Amino acid sequence: MSKIIGIDLGTTNSCVAVLDGGQVKIIENAEGARTTPSIVAYMDDGETLVGAPAKRQAVTNPKNTLYAVKRLIGRKFDEKAVQKDIDLMPYSIVKADNGDAWVEVHGKKLAPPQVSAEVLRKMKKTAEDYLGEEVTEAVITVPAYFNDSQRQATKDAGRIAGLEVKRIINEPTAAALAFGLDKTEKGDRKIVVYDLGGGTFDVSIIEIADVDGEMQFEVLSTNGDTFLGGEDFDQRIIDYIISEFKKEQGVDLSKDVLALQRLKEAAEKAKIELSSSQQTEINLPYITADASGPKHLNLKITRAKLEALVEELIERTIEPCRVAIKDAGVKVSDIDDVILVGGMTRMPKVQDKVKEFFGREPRKDVNPDEAVAAGAAIQGSVLSGERKDVLLLDVTPLSLGIETLGGVMTKMIQKNTTIPTRYSQTFSTADDNQPAVTIKVFQGEREIAAGNKGLGEFNLEGIPPAPRGLPQIEVTFDIDANGILHVSAKDKGTGKENKITIKANSGLSEDEIQRMVKDAEANAEEDHRLAELAQARNQADALVHATRKSLTEYGEKLEAAEKESIEAAIKDLEDILKTGDKAEIDAKVEALSTASQKLGEKMYADMQAQQQAQQQQAADNAKPVDDNVVDADFKEVKRDQ
């Protein structure tokens, strides 16, 4: 049975792990790194770069290099948070036909799940290279505060990447799994997972209990902000640099896409450096130019300055912590451990704030970049039956309900309800002889339905004529273990049951997913073709170099016509190298190999002659040095005793 891998699909970085020989193994990618930047670049020649190669060329290709796409997944274009990102991102965010936020590259519209699928494909390939077998199943993590649309979109991304997503698991819960299974402490423990990543923030209160030798992880509550993370911290630094440069040089860098990409890189680097040093210098020569000539950027930033810039962002993480503690029905003093997850938790000011709120030092024995993927791999091993000593009880992060008379949100399933769960409630008609009802499903905590996230709507038709309030329509909400919602309705009067799944007012249709799966497969073929082409070019290049070298050494031993023939074949191969396809290059390589045959024979003959000369020399050296030695006869003389 093939392994179920665990993937942490992050806003900034992604990570893949697997349970191998009973131990969690974080798998290194082709570049030798344990995490992969969640960056996808679409090149002019049709090639798609993912991870570090995409990040390296971002400065020169800002419009076609997509990063932090997770912030758009499952979101509407008109949402306030998306509108804010439109002004900040160098790439183009556009409105899809269904109202979702998509991106545009080379004039082609792409859905965020399609872009995320490229990252997942790299994670899949990384795992396959390590395991030496095909991988088709995965557990993928999402922020605990992701809503239904965002979870559905993440699942779609997995399908487009050629993965069957066995489970969508919340990131803090995954980190708790990775932490809890390592620990030898006995007895029940309540832990807090504070997860501040590249684009999202989550906090979960989790109880770890030993129930008859089985480790039970029960999520008591969760809260967060899906638009708060390291990207926002970077933006504060970028804004500061722009304002300082404008003061100093009178030039506004915010309109210069190339400069912005360089600033983003520098801001991220400065932020990381200031976690371990008190001061850093941002040095960007030739950042821009005006009539007076090129301008250089040189700016010192202290840790204190950075902390002042981001203080309000760190403060914003505390309110969700307060709400999570209250919802879990525990006191801060009941918490046994505080676990920090996500790269941003390396910032000393963040650690201080967490310590101040929870009144205890956060644990330092959990790797903030790898814990989530490790937990996902553990959950994968539970689902495959490899591990049987772990039980995970997660919750739905937001309340679910329907819109009833007067636009009120009637909650069917309260937030922090353990999943999977099912709940039914009976509703009726608002008018006499009403033939149908429209059921609108929402997710959120507001009292008025319109203030919450609309997940979809459906009609129940064919209700027999009756006075209002008489028909009985039973609505059932069913949340699966992935936190994804299914809704059905039944007319109790007629006994007629309609199984109705929400017709999502956003997200990808089945046809779109299938088309994207085909696109991804075609891409894989294209990637394979490009890899083969690169290999053919490298081999051809090596042959040209070796032939030239041999021609220099042995060329004078050839006939003039033979030499010309080889030189012509070299030129033909060089001409085709940059523009030709694999078949054309292979043909010219074959032609050069044939033309060089005589040269090879001459080289071989020369080497043979050299070898024979060396052997002769060695044989001569082995002869005795003195030829004048005379052999003497001797006779044994026996002495008388």
Curated annotation (Swiss-Prot):
Biased composition (Basic and acidic residues): 632-641
Keywords: ATP-binding, Chaperone, Nucleotide-binding, Phosphoprotein, Stress response
InterPro entries: ATPase_NBD, Chaperone_DnaK, Heat_shock_70_CS, HSP70_C_sf, HSP70_peptide-bd_sf, Hsp_70_fam
Induction trigger: By stress conditions e.g. heat shock.
Listed PROSITE patterns: HSP70_1, HSP70_2, HSP70_3
Cross-referenced Pfam families: HSP70
SUPFAM superfamilies per record: Actin-like ATPase domain, Heat shock protein 70kD (HSP70), C-terminal subdomain, Heat shock protein 70kD (HSP70), peptide-binding domain
Region annotated Disordered, chain positions: 606-641
GO MF terms held by the record: ATP binding; ATP-dependent protein folding chaperone; unfolded protein binding
Feature: compositional bias, Low complexity: 608-619
Residues carrying Phosphothreonine: T200
The protein's role, per its UniProt record: Acts as a chaperone.
PANTHER family: HEAT SHOCK PROTEIN 70KDA (PTHR19375)
Recorded family membership: Belongs to the heat shock protein 70 family.
Protein name in the entry: Chaperone protein DnaK
Source species: Bordetella parapertussis (strain 12822 / ATCC BAA-587 / NCTC 13253)
